[in-house]
Amino acid sequence: MSISSASVSPAYRDPLIAQIVERGVAEIFPGGAAALAERLAQADRPLRVKLGIDPTRPDLHLGHSVVLRKLRQFQDAGHVAILLIGDFTALVGDPTGQSEARPRLTPAEVEENARTYLEQAGKILDFETPGRLEVRRNSEWLAHLTLSELIELQAQMTVGQMLAKEDFAQRYQAGTPVYLHEFLYPLLQGYDSVALAADVELGGTDQRFNLLTGRDLQIWKGQAPQFCLTVPLLEGLDGYQKMSKSKNNYVGLTEDPLTMYSKLEKVPDHLVERYFELLTSVPLAELPQDPRQRQILLAKTLVAQFHSPAAAEEAQRTAQALVLDGILAETGSIPTFAIDGLSYPVKLSYILRECGLCKSAAEARRQIQGGAVRLDGQKVEDPDLEFAHASELAGRILQVGKKAFRRLVKGAD
């Protein structure tokens, strides 16, 4: 069943519009799916669709990709995606969902995180088609607000309204400090919509208060208020908590194909259809009936999206080859060995010694000649096998015997 139960008038059954307003949508306001569908159908210009991201972490996971995919759908329908880097608001810290104030980042940390965010967002958004994407930073306008302008902005909301925000209310009632600068965050995010003249703003369900603040400030400034579209928060691999790197229940967008595949083929049964709806374009009516086949299709589909179909096929073959004695070798629990510090070209026998799978290069050669060494489940037969670049090894599983493994990685994993 679709997450959104919204019904769209047959007059607006353009498949691109239907996908935008129906699939993977939690709420659209004001007016619901039909109102936004009508606005999209009757638009005489590309709409400006805003998504703000605060670069508080250096990497993205599948949970972040849900709203990025929704932004891409607007691009595919001919509208302008505005990817707003909250380099100024990141210095404040979004209090949403926080039981205490966020640690404040340095400008250098924010800029480095923004750089990696953009690299990873390029896996989903259209960065190539002219006129389909604007990348902006809210320091362009927020850093230049005068004190009088800031006071005028703060005068648009009361303390009572701020304390109605669930996160603030819970902390206030619990006696946990709520700092004045945190009250600024919803106002600054809302002011971004004014500065960008946004027609639509996207966000997770936890951003509802901030999105509505944007509408209020646009009305205050005499602009047409934006539509707000929220998407569900994706549960992590544990099956219940929001996907988060801190909870170790995530799938990173930059993970190698085998790691990504191995995690996704074990998504809990009750979440598989939800993952398909939020993370893919596969018609839900066409999903296999067999639960195991659904998991496999999900894993292959997402690896193909973020890597390639060939990488997905290879990851599936490798994962199957790593089934030993009926027990799947969990890639997340396999010790890692960093390969980017090696001098290339490098022999596999040297790697076997350095990573601790063999005590010496001579032992490594004997293990290879005895047929005990496998790379991604395939038996290695050449004791002099060597590799010219780290890219040939990254993400692969090195195995000696039945139970000794190393996952080869670039840098710290």
UniProtKB/Swiss-Prot annotation:
Keywords: Aminoacyl-tRNA synthetase, ATP-binding, Cytoplasm, Ligase, Nucleotide-binding, Protein biosynthesis, RNA-binding. GO terms for cellular component: cytosol. GO terms for biological process: tyrosyl-tRNA aminoacylation. Residues 346-410 form the S4 RNA-binding domain. It comes from the Bacteria. ATP binds at residue 245. It catalyses: tRNA(Tyr) + L-tyrosine + ATP = L-tyrosyl-tRNA(Tyr) + AMP + diphosphate + H(+). It is an enzyme of class 6 (ligase). InterPro entries: aa-tRNA-synth_Ic, Rossmann-like_a/b/a_fold, S4_RNA-bd_sf, SYY-like_C, Tyr-tRNA-ligase, Tyr-tRNA-ligase_bac-type, Tyr-tRNA-ligase_bac_2. Its EC number is 6.1.1.1. SUPFAM superfamilies: Alpha-L RNA-binding motif, Nucleotidylyl transferase. Its main location: cytoplasm. One of its GO terms (molecular function) is tyrosine-tRNA ligase activity. A motif ('KMSKS' region) lies at residues 242-246. It is found in: Cytoplasm. A motif ('HIGH' region) lies at residues 55-64. HAMAP family: Tyr_tRNA_synth_type2. PANTHER family: TYROSINE--TRNA LIGASE (PTHR11766:SF1), TYROSYL-TRNA SYNTHETASE (PTHR11766). NCBIfam families: tyrS. Catalyzes the attachment of tyrosine to tRNA(Tyr) in a two-step reaction: tyrosine is first activated by ATP to form Tyr-AMP and then transferred to the acceptor end of tRNA(Tyr). Belongs to the class-I aminoacyl-tRNA synthetase family. TyrS type 2 subfamily. Homodimer. This is Tyrosine--tRNA ligase. It comes from Synechococcus sp. (strain JA-2-3B'a(2-13)). The gene is tyrS.
